[in-house]
Every structure is written in structure tokens, then in C-alpha cells.
Amino acid sequence: VAAAHDEHTLEAVFRAADDKLIEPVLIGNKAKITEILKELNVEYDLNSIICTDSDKESAEKTVELINSNKADFIMKGKLQTADLLRAVVDKEKGLRTGRVMSHVAFLEIPAYHKLIAVTDGGMMMYPNAEEKKQILENAVDVFRAMGYECPKIAVLAAVETVNPKMPETVDADIL
């Protein structure tokens, strides 16, 4: 978690940890993280917190951990999106894969029995069909990293039937 010194972020992280979905790696202001963990009554090895002095350093350290396979995915804590993305897209130390960059937002609905995710709610403003395919591949990779062998995917558009005047429906049909 980049810049993990945020109460809501840590609540979500440790709910996921309690459900055995993740093993958190906390990066950021160690004093603030420690204080929040105590307030939340969470047990965590405080010596494993990676202390950084700035949001920029938190973002860079997070990317370094991904590149060295010491972490599997990034969760944004209390830092500006621009600071995190600067580290992610850095030409020398970033996370370039050859595919488009997209994000995945997870939704926990108390009355529903499954974890739901929505991918790319706005990073790619007008993706073409090939870019949409890459966005889906990114989301599938995230789910596989979380232990889901065959995630179920639905491609959404404004209407359910293919309409040649609506390129999104044509792309959805192809995907």
C-alpha cells in the first residue's frame, strides 16, 4: 500500500487480510501508520512497515517492490494519484508491460456473495477494441494473482443488443 497512513485504506486492507485475500505490505509514514493501526486495534508486525519520508518516495518504493516481485499489486493510500502514476510510468524504473495501463476497483456488496470488480472507469478515455481487450486481460491477471483461476467477465454497454451506430456495443460483441 503506497502511503498507507490513511484510516479508511488500512480498514479495507485489514478486512481483506482477515479474509485471507491479501498479505499487506505497508509503505509510508511509519509513525502515522502505527498510530492508525493502534486505533483500529490491528495486530501487524510494526518492524515490517517500510518507512518513507514523502509521497514520492512511497510511490517509488511501491513500484520497486512490484518490480522485484516482493509485492503483487498496488493499492493507493493517502497520496496524490499523479505522484503514484509518475512512479508507475517512469521510463527507467516504472511498470511498463507493453499493454495499456488500467485500474481495477473492487466492490464488496454486503447482500451479494461474490467480490465484484470494475475495470477502467476512466484511465483510458476512448479505448479502441484492442485496448479494451488489453484492459480485460489486465483485470483477468489481477484476479488470477488473487487466486481466481477462471474469473467471470461481463462487458457492459448502454444497451444489451449490438447496434452498429454504437461502437461500444460492437466492441462488446467482439470481446
Regions found by a protein language model. Give the residues of each.
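Anion-binding alpha/beta catalytic cores of soluble intermediary-metabolism enzymes, centered on
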Residues: V1-L175
